[in-house]
Amino acid sequence: MDIKQYKEQAKLIRDNETYKVYDLLTLKDLNLSLTELNPGKETAGHSHKEADEVYVFIDGKGRIEVGEERIAVKESDVVAIPGGKFHKVFNEGESILSFWSIFEKYEGRDK
């Protein structure tokens, strides 16, 4: 997959005033997705009971909360999220905050 052409190759699974989410690569047990979070918006936040997750920030700036920790993020930052930790992303910039998510596949992902 040519990562620069992801939108032509990806499956758009969410599109609303807050963000767009694309599934880029789905393996038997692993997903790679892209979130484009609009300025001034935040994700709903969630946790995965036992699965770890990795976020790779590719554009924009903002903040991620992982449990009680608040971390400023920008392009090229990587954040590891341990299983069971609630996490939420905030776009504090004036442009779209884009990040890759790498996580274990789960039932109902595309709903």
Model feature map: region roles:
Residues 1-30, 44, 79, 110-111:
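A short, N-terminal "cap"/entry segment at the start of jelly-roll beta-barrel domains
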Residues 18, 33-48:
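Conserved short histidine dyad/triad with adjacent acidic residue
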Residues 28, 39, 50, 69, ...:
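A generic "binding-loop/recognition-motif" signal
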Residues 28-30, 38-41, 61-63, 105-108:
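Short, charged/polar surface micro-motifs in flexible loops or helix N-caps
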Residues 36-38, 49-64:
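Short, conserved beta-strand element in jelly-roll/cupin
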Residues 42-44, 63, 79, 83-89:
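Histidine-centered metal-chelating micro-motifs
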Residues 69-83:
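Short acidic-glycine-tyrosine-enriched beta hairpin
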Residues 83-109:
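Ligand-binding loop in jelly-roll beta-barrel domains
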